[in-house]
């Protein structure tokens, strides 16, 4: 199947479970399936399996229209990107906090990308490119599945809910996309789309916005500033997370404490398991597989 997907409405989506939506409204990119929902204004929502139960919260009027995410949401400090925490309430009164993050794919990566801990910047940063939305979700789902590396290591992350593309066009110069980079992402999304499903193409004049489920807690950098986490332990935690990511076949080029979320227990102490801090990761614009994992995947595919 090579046709464009046929979107369904939010109303029609109520008739289906995720697996029962017809294939003509479904795409599979980088190994992840999405259902395309469009509203009456032409806004598009590529909803993941994990996001399907939250789709009633995704209506644009709940968080996007009139820039509600900026006026009512909390601006999060994540490098130079635009990221917001936005509480939403659906028509049934169910509340869900979403993370709203504007994709920067095909833009230049800021030169000040660097790690707070450890001190050495990876060589990959010099040629780094932001993942496109489907690429990032694909890598994130792969990381969450944890099929590579030690089974006892499971990396917790925020849940990928949907990729939102507003109907309104935006002048390319305002988006800051380089045409050459954008065309490479177009080719990559075509190459990594499953032929059994409909296929999509990126639009040069449309925005793409990530929607994640909010991860409760506070980042390690803030805990360090508050004095609840010492600099030595913050440094050790950051190196431990980097090591565990590598063992699971991944690396994040701008890895830093502000991307590591910690929680407190009922006594107000940082949550630990067997003496080690329990953490979850956020921010995956520069997530990539290690060479070892890429080699493993190539060898596996050659056997198929």
Model-derived features: positions:
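Short, well-ordered beta-strand micro-motif
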Residues: 85-87, 211-216, 280-283
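Conserved kinase catalytic-core helix
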Residues: 143, 147-150, 182-197, 201-266
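Glycine-rich, phosphate-binding/catalytic loops in enzymes
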Residues: 116-117, 228-230, 297-300
